[in-house]
Design a protein with these regions (language model features):
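An acidic-aromatic
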Residues: 216-237
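N-terminal secretory targeting and juxtamembrane "stalk" segments of secreted and cell-surface proteins
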Residues: 195-203, 214-216, 241, 353-354
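Blade-loop segments of beta-propeller domains
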Residues: 233-250
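Short, conserved, GDST-rich strand-edge loop motifs in beta-rich repeat architectures
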Residues: 155-160, 212-221
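Primary recognition of N-terminal secretory signal peptides and signal-anchoring hydrophobic helices
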Residues: 2-15, 20-199, 226-230, 251, ...
Length: 389
């Protein structure tokens, strides 16, 4: 399993997450009074991206553009053009810096910088070490490797001026409206590893639906997923689960006006006030202790995917019966056998092209699509919902 941290190489690359100490960024090749420009990139776990702008090493201190630092440290940014100042907002923290000034403020308290923020090619650069240490992150410097290690602490999601942070190691959930510091409002049950950001949707006045998802590990086969419903700063409900596999998480998130909360074995649909409108015990329905993805839902039926086998399932809400789709539609026997064999092999990386996909329902007739393995032709198959009884 690769390191979950990001690493910065001053000579070539900036690989990173977030962690800080008061170590000076000096080395034999860089004089302390020099200003050096270094093209860099960012690596998070097994993902690498090149930074558009070079980093600056000035008097042994590393400076990055405001947006890069705020992105790495999960901070919100407010720029005041009149005063040429930038304010960064994070969890229980406010940092203010001014272009060209060595005077900064952390939580309204005056602090003196080693190097001031500076303008380079229309971009404002600010000192990385100062900002990171202000939010209690510790950066370690390896002289021999010329690398800085910066582990990630928070994931962030924003929608309509509302920001949420999740502390990865504890699941603590924080909230801030507009240009404010983040304050704790509750917890999510899952502890995440490498997640950088997550989705936030404003579903009603003061009500937000949070959706979290991450893949990690050597092949990205370890997965965490979760959901939370927040109204007026209060967590109304939340759920999550962890699982392993090559296949994507195909769970839907909303059905009409309701949102989904699931742990992979139970599913419930809530309205905007957190009232449960429907609840299903998926493992009881199927009489199998597996993880199930909810791919479609209405008052008549539900489409599930058994994650380990990738078999598609139709559940008739009225008759309270469930069937495997491949057993009911008119697939050639050879194709059924292929699906059955693939479903039995827990280590098989099933070809995503060759699984059954729900298409639509018209007048009670459901249609599905499947690409045959024998000729790679996509065919359409039908199933009458009344047969699921």
């Amino acid at each position: 399993m690769p390191s979950l941290s990001k690493k910065i190489s001053v000579t070539a690359i900036l690989c990173g997450s977030i962690f800080f100490s008061a170590t000076e960024f000096t080395n034999e090749a860089v004089a302390k009074n020099a200003k050096v420009y270094v093209q860099a990139g960012v690596e998070s776990a097994d993902q690498y991206s090149q930074l558009k702008d070079p980093i600056i090493i000035d008097q042994g201190r590393i400076l990055l553009p405001i947006r890069d630092i705020s992105d790495q440290l999960s901070l919100n940014v407010q720029w005041n053009q009149k005063t040429k100042s930038v304010t960064l907002y994070g969890v229980n923290k406010e940092i203010k810096l001014t272009l060209g000034s060595i005077t900064a403020y952390v939580d309204k308290k005056k602090v003196t910088l080693d190097v001031p923020p500076q303008m380079e090619k229309s971009k404002i650069y600010i000192p990385l070490q100062f900002v990171a240490s202000s939010v209690k992150q510790k950066v370690t410097w390896d002289r021999s490797l010329k690398e800085i290690t910066i582990p990630r602490t928070y994931a962030k999601g924003t929608e309509n001026q509302m920001t949420y942070w999740i502390k990865l190691s504890t699941g603590e959930l924080y909230q801030a409206k507009g240009n404010q510091i983040g304050t704790k409002i509750g917890n999510v049950s899952n502890k995440f590893k490498t997640m950088k950001d997550f989705q936030v949707e404003n579903i009603a006045a003061g009500t937000y639906y949070l959706r979290m998802n991450e893949n990690y590990g050597m092949s990205g086969t370890s997965r965490n997923t979760g959901q939370a419903l927040v109204k007026n700063g209060k967590v109304l409900d939340e759920d999550s689960f962890s699982f392993m596999g090559y296949y994507p998480d195909t769970t839907l998130h909303k059905s009409h006006a309701n949102v989904l909360m699931t742990n992979g074995k139970k599913a419930r649909f809530l309205d905007k006030n957190g009232v449960v409108k429907a609840e299903y015990h998926l493992t009881d329905m199927m009489q199998k202790d597996e993880i199930y993805m909810v791919e479609h839902y209405n008052q008549r039926f539900m489409i599930l995917r058994e994650y380990a086998s990738q078999h598609l399932i139709v559940y008739n809400v009225q008759s309270e019966q469930a069937v495997y789709v491949h057993e009911m539609i008119s697939l050639p026997e050879s194709e059924k056998d292929d699906l059955e064999q693939a479903g039995l092999d827990r280590n098989n990386e099933m070809e995503r092209d060759h699984i059954i996909i729900f298409d639509r329902i018209i007048d009670g007739i459901m249609t599905f699509q499947y690409k045959n393995k024998s000729d790679n032709v996509v065919n359409t198959y039908t199933l009458d919902l009344s047969q699921v009884r």
